[in-house]
Amino acid sequence: MESQTGRKSARRLSMTKKKSQSVCPIKERTSNGGAASITSFFRNTPPSKLACPLCGKLVPRYKINEHIDSQCQNFLVEDDGKQKEITKAPSNSALASNNEREKSPGDKDADTSPFFKKNCAVRRDSSETDSQAKPVKTVGLGSLSSKLSRRALRLSDESGVNLTRVSDNEKDHNADLNRSQKENCMNSLTFGSERNGTDADNILETEPEASNQPQLKNVEKSASDSSISSDVHTSSSSVLKRKSMEIPKNDTNTTETCIAHKKSRFFQSSIERGDESKVKSDQTEASSSAYDVPTSKSPIKSKTTQEEIEKELNKTPANEHNMLDVEKVGEGSEQQPTRLPYYLRNFRTVLEAVLENEDDRRLFNEDDFSTIQSFQQLSVPGQMLYVRLFQRKLKWLQVCKVEYTEISTDLRPVVQELVACGFLQTESELHDLHEVLDLLPAPELRNLAKTFHLGRGGSQKQQLVEGLLQLGKQRSLFAGQNNTAAVILKRAKQAAGSCVRLCRSSRVVFSRVLLLFTLTDTLEEEDLASGGQGQLYTILLVNSGRLAFPEYTVHRSARLFKDRDDLIRYETAMRALQEVIAAMQSGSWEDAYDLYTTAMAAWQEIKDSCDLSHQEQLPVFLRCFTVGWTYTRILSRGVEILQRLKRYEDAVEQLRNLLSQSVYCVDSRGRWWDRLALNLQQHLKQHEQAIGAIRDGLNDPLARTGHKLSLYQRASRMKESASLKKYRLLLRDLPTVHVQDVTHVTIRGQLFPHEGGMGKSVFLRAASEDEGSGGGQGTVLMCSVEDLALEHYRTLGFDQGIHGEGSTFSTLFGLLMWDIIFMDGVPDVFLNPYQTCPLDLHTDCFYGSRREAIEARAEMLREASVETLQDLIADVWSTQEGRVCALINWERFSTPQQAQSLVACLGGHFLSGVFLRMAKDYRHCRGGLPDLVVWSTSSNKYKLVEVKGPNDRLSQKQQIWLDELRKLGADVEVCHVTATGARGARRE
């Protein structure tokens, strides 16, 4: 045993000997300016443990600071700034070999940064005698760290923060200062350990003019002479933690980092620092609130300087700062109370906009206003959390999983505030077993199922939920005991923990406010369950300048809703419509049928009990925002549901009910007539009734273009059918709809084989010279049928071509009719500043309200020269480019010059005729226009082409448009693309 101990001691002494032998040569080489080899560094690794300078205990070398700051028993700090009492500590001379590196004056000069050599030259000369007279005492690194920490904290308590300015001498040597930063960082440990205790005290007690250089963070150091600022504080995280209970946050002053200095290089002039106490006195007292951002550990700068620094360093445009949830605070300033996040600011904007309108205010009662007022009285974190939860789907949420770090790291106090104010429900009101089970994650649900001996380890969540629900339906065998469902509910709630859900009573109030604000949005795209998240984001984009709407005058004169109950009925109908649409999209036709029948019963009850004459008096473009219009849309979708379920007789009955009225959804009458005739003729084989439906549909003035042609074509097929000869006399007297055919051409292309055969056809074509430059000769590209046709017409001399379908002409229509579309003087077509078109654009009212202006513009275009047309395009493009308009796709033309070249080919006469037709019935004329527009800039010739792939045919709307374009003098044709083998495309 003794021999083993001896060997261990010998080994340890041997290591110490090697260490002393290896360290000294390196120090000598360093002092002589040489560089130690990297191999010697790896051969002589430092020891894994070091002796504590206070208690002598061996601790891991990487944890020496943590041991001294938090674990060492001999490290004591007394109050009133007294010195630390160190007992049972080894002498400084015993630790000299580990904690100090003695150098000659020449060596110290060699290792000193140029910054300290130049900036401190004057002070060194003036005080050379005094510095030589002072005794030199070696102080261990740990002792110096604790002394600096204690003295720095004491000075911050007694005298606050010392204000510093840049001296003239430091300004002259700014370049040398920048070059010396790397050396300062590397030499800081050696520099700090060489200073004696007296000098360290003098450094902290002296108050010279400090430079604008950053002081090194996370490094314990003292400065050479008076070039270091007197307000140097240690930044050891453990010391700050130990003193956090003694020092107020307001008085904490920390050092800047070397990174901050790199940023300060952009500014050659010094920054005038203000009094810290003044700045902090202006801050809000609620700094401990969950909403307030913690105080930054950096010197204070003015707000103007902060913004300049951010713009210079980050190169961020000024308008992009509005996009942030919280204002940025630069690295050299304390964070001030932040601005509100965009979703809360915009939510407040919605509330103000709705409640400022007198007609909208009438739609809320005292209880509604009380709810809104209670929300406004919430704290800022409470309002932020409520809006966040309002934007989510209405369901129960586990509090532990609700995380919004921008609000607070601990949301429990905020949740308690919302519960106390009646905005949130707690788990005490959670009584539905299905809701609790859906709330649990899969692991907890499996544990719950194991408790009741259900499921296997790999069971899916839905299977576990169904199994537990089925088990809950069983009754207990013993009287007086809780049933199984109650036991499962109790266990599930225990597993879920604290849960909350928005109160429905308060949520519906804000939902109605949002509904009034977003009334003009496309209803299918606006998910009511999202709490208007899309609209709030739209407001954010507008406020930040990233989204712009056309300029127009909001003019409201008509009252949409008669009273509060009318608004509530409309909201209920809208939710029912959304539920039906969701069920249809998911393919749940039985569920959709149940929702449809429920809505039909509700609509019948409203018709029997309410006076709807107010809705009938509204113009048709406002009537679509009524409860009657919404329920009629549900009934129209019910026809599709009934047809999916093969209930054609019920579908026919519903279609006849819809056609019996002409107040709601009048733009769908043509589609209803067409569907009624199809069901009667094809599914129910009631041919005579089908002929009657065709006759009534053709005579209906509200049935438009494509649907009338469809009815006429059905009658023609019935007339030619051999099995329906007995009905030819009935079919002879029907009104006729004549459409003349246009030119048809056929090209061939190699079809790309793909599995399934579904979707659009994909063809292969040879790349052109420009396209094949990167891939060499013989490059083959995959393309659509329209691209294949474009390449074909390019070979015919049409150097320009666009595949835009109706968007090409609607864009030209919007550009040349912009001022008329957004003209003043038409009431109730603009209800809020976020509309992309007037509300009457898709109705007959659009043309009726602007008849004179539209006809005058059409006449002007008819007589206009090419230069006039191009000037009109350029003028609108330059003033309105980028504004969101339902008619214009700003990316349809690559440049305004391309649009100008197209109108030069089309001519004013042709454009006038097209625009006049679109203005009269945009709802039914926006579709059916040709796919391609190709033209030649050299010959000013153009061609309008409808492309049809394999097994594709023209629709009724396309046939009507082709005939109308032909009548206006356009060169139109239908290009059929047929699939072929590996041969190239060629025209027949």
Curated annotation (Swiss-Prot):
Residue spans of biased composition, Polar residues class: 89-98, 183-195, 284-303
Keyword ATP-binding: no
Main location (coarse class): nucleus
UniProt cofactor(s): Mn(2+); Mg(2+)
Null allele phenotype: Increased DNA damage response, apoptosis and development of abnormalities such as kidney cysts.
EC nos: 3.1.21.-, 3.1.4.1
Biased composition (Basic and acidic residues): 99-111, 167-182, 272-283
Domain of life: Eukaryota
Binding-site positions, Zn(2+): C52, C55, H67, C72
Record's compositionally biased regions (Low complexity): 224-238
Intracellular or extracellular location(s): Nucleus
Catalytic activity: Hydrolytically removes 5'-nucleotides successively from the 3'-hydroxy termini of 3'-hydroxy-terminated oligonucleotides
GO molecular function, one term: 5'-flap endonuclease activity
Function: Nuclease required for the repair of DNA interstrand cross-links (ICL) recruited at sites of DNA damage by monoubiquitinated FANCD2. Specifically involved in repair of ICL-induced DNA breaks by being required for efficient homologous recombination, probably in the resolution of homologous recombination intermediates. Acts as a 5'-3' exonuclease that anchors at a cut end of DNA and cleaves DNA successively at every third nucleotide, allowing to excise an ICL from one strand through flanking incisions. Probably keeps excising with 3'-flap annealing until it reaches and unhooks the ICL.
Sequence similarity: Belongs to the FAN1 family.
Assembly: Interacts with fancd2 (when monoubiquitinated).
Entry's free-text remark on domains: The UBZ4-type zinc finger specifically binds monoubiquitinated fancd2.
This protein's name: Fanconi-associated nuclease 1
Source species: Danio rerio (Zebrafish)
